[in-house]
Structure formats: C-alpha cells, structure tokens
C-alpha cells in the first residue's frame, strides 16, 4: 500500500473530521481519481508524435493511455471528426496513490523556478486541475530519449463538496500551494 494512502487513513481522516466537524467517516473527502490528459495537436501531420506521447504517458502513469479522437471537424485547425489528437489516462486505486505521492514529493519540486501551484485552480466542487509544461519533470522519463517536450493536464477528482474541503484535503498531503 502506498505511504500516502496509509497517511490518509491514519492522520488526514481524523484531521479533516475535526476541522469540518463531520459526523461520519464517510463524509470525509477522499481522492477518487486522477486524470492525465495530453493534447497532441501536431499529431495531424505526424502520427509518430502521438505514439511517442502515448509512450511517455504510459511510462509516467504505469498504464496504457486511451487515444482521444476529435469530436467534430474544425476547418481552422485542419482536423476532421475521428482524427486521433491526444491521449488520456484515468488512475484509480493503488496507482493513483503512488502517482500522487510521486507528483508531490518528486515531480513538482523538479519544475524550474517552482514557487508552488495556484490555490485558485479548484472548480467549485472540490476538484483540482493543473497543467505541467514539461513531461521531463517525472524521473521515469529519460531526457535523452524525449523527441519533444510536451505538457500535460492533471485533474485530481475528490469527493469534496466545496473548494475549501478539497483544498484542506490536498493541503493535508503537503500539496505545495503558493502562499
């Protein structure tokens, strides 16, 4: 079991129950899933770019990504409906906890000029979204084998009802919010 999951069960649940005065342990917010998304717009011209992006995402997440396709044709972007334009992975359970642990303790501190992540990126329902400009902040990615530096979107979906609860949950995991 991931250390972060143990820490959640032993410390965070009690801490949040006390802070928000929940009557049941089931009311305490928990991380439900983490979604990683990588849009590869250049894949229209070169299919190899999408394969490389999917391989990078598989290394980062430990799971084979789903290739996302364009929902409708857009002449301005020169894409047609059904064209593969990105990839995504949904992490749950053990892999989710391991990824969150690596993100907080290893990957985010490796970002250049890192001063913390914005605390304003909550969606109003306690879910947190952030973008990473370079996939090379993850230690699993070999810098010499990267063909192009790509960014990815990370969405942390929680069972929290409000942004305050979601922020308290992530702050309890020592999530590096900007002061």
UniProtKB/Swiss-Prot annotation:
Coiled coil: none annotated. Part of the 50S ribosomal subunit; part of the 5S rRNA/L5/L18/L25 subcomplex. Contacts the 5S rRNA and the P site tRNA. Forms a bridge to the 30S subunit in the 70S ribosome. This is one of the proteins that bind and probably mediate the attachment of the 5S RNA into the large ribosomal subunit, where it forms part of the central protuberance. In the 70S ribosome it contacts protein S13 of the 30S subunit (bridge B1b), connecting the 2 subunits; this bridge is implicated in subunit movement. Contacts the P site tRNA; the 5S rRNA and some of its associated proteins might help stabilize positioning of ribosome-bound tRNAs. GO terms for biological process: translation. Belongs to the universal ribosomal protein uL5 family. One of its GO terms (cellular component) is ribosome. The keyword tRNA-binding applies. The lineage of its organism: Bacteria, Pseudomonadati, Pseudomonadota, Gammaproteobacteria, Vibrionales. One of its GO terms (molecular function) is tRNA binding. This is Large ribosomal subunit protein uL5. InterPro entries: Ribosomal_uL5, Ribosomal_uL5_bac-type, Ribosomal_uL5_C, Ribosomal_uL5_CS, Ribosomal_uL5_dom_sf, Ribosomal_uL5_N. Keywords: Ribonucleoprotein, Ribosomal protein, RNA-binding, rRNA-binding, tRNA-binding.
């Amino acid at each position: 079991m991931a250390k972060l999951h143990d820490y959640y069960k032993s410390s965070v649940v009690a801490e949040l129950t006390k802070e928000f005065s929940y009557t049941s342990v089931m009311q305490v917010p928990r991380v439900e899933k983490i979604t990683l998304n990588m849009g590869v717009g250049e894949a229209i011209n070169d299919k190899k770019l999408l394969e490389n992006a999917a391989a990078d995402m598989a290394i980062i997440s430990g799971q084979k990504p789903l290739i996302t396709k364009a929902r409708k044709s857009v002449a301005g972007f020169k894409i047609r409906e059904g064209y593969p334009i990105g990839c995504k992975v949904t992490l749950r359970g053990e892999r989710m906890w391991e990824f969150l642990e690596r993100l907080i303790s290893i990957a985010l501190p490796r970002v250049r000029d890192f001063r913390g992540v914005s605390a304003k990126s909550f969606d109003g329902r306690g879910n947190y979204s952030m973008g990473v400009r370079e996939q090379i902040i993850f230690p699993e990615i070999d810098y010499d084998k990267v063909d192009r530096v790509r960014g990815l979107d990370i969405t942390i979906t929680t069972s929290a009802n409000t942004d305050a609860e979601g922020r308290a949950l992530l702050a309890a995991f020592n999530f590096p919010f900007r002061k």
